Amino acid sequence: MKMTSKKMKDELMKRLSRPEWDFQYDSEKEVLRIEQKDSKKGINVSLPGVVAKWEVNKEKAIEEVAYYVQEALIAMHKEENSAAKILPVIRSTSFPKQAEEGNPFIMTDHTAETRIYYALDSNKTYRLIDERLLQKLGLTEQQVREMALFNARSLSYEFKQDTVAGNTFYFLNTNDGYDATRILNESLLQSMREKISGDMVVAVPHQDVLIIADIVNEIGYDIIAQMTMKFFAEGHVPITSLSFVYEDGDFEPIFILAKNRKKTDGKEKG
């Protein structure tokens, strides 16, 4: 059998076929490129050189090249994942629970309106962690949660401040994709609680904003409700139009408090 570059290309593609890898063939230069779908990092193989080796070593030449490419791509993938950070992201409870049928995302309950998902972020690529990716990473769900919360605490924060009718509003909007994630930083919430004199209200209307408010009167509640609705409507990744009263580590949706107030008011009038 006479070996050609085209036959060698077909042989290598057959041996290196994996769902996470792509092939590109330049017939003019007789080069086969094998690359990772996610990162686009890869290896170029000059086919005439492999054919020349095949003329001498036959099957062994193909095995050596396939092994070299496979090991190099796996090493690249490990290097990329070791440089990547796992971070939590806040999503609405209506957000999909599966990447595709039979492949659920790794999730944690947060509030009645929000759920925590986990992202593998290597600066260039961003992917929510599902069960299949979890297996590739060689981590447990608990390890992912612990790593994510640790990394969330390292996110910087600097608030802009505005006061309306005696109520003070603090805005975080760095646009790093993790503004809403800061709601999981317990030490940040506690430090804000210490400087707030009224009710501490927290809102994550969309992915790129965290609002913390010092509410001292009913006008403040009206303002935060309108503000949250406006941000929710404008966000690229909307989360919830509701805001929450934060107390002792718990988040109570405002509409529940409003209902309770109405019941109390009704009893007093009766």
UniProtKB/Swiss-Prot annotation:
Pfam families in the record: DUF1444 (PF07285)
Source species, domain of life: Bacteria
Family the UniProt entry places it in: Belongs to the UPF0354 family.
User: What protein name does the entry list?
Assistant: UPF0354 protein BCAH187_A4826
Q: Which organism is it from?
A: Bacillus cereus (strain AH187)
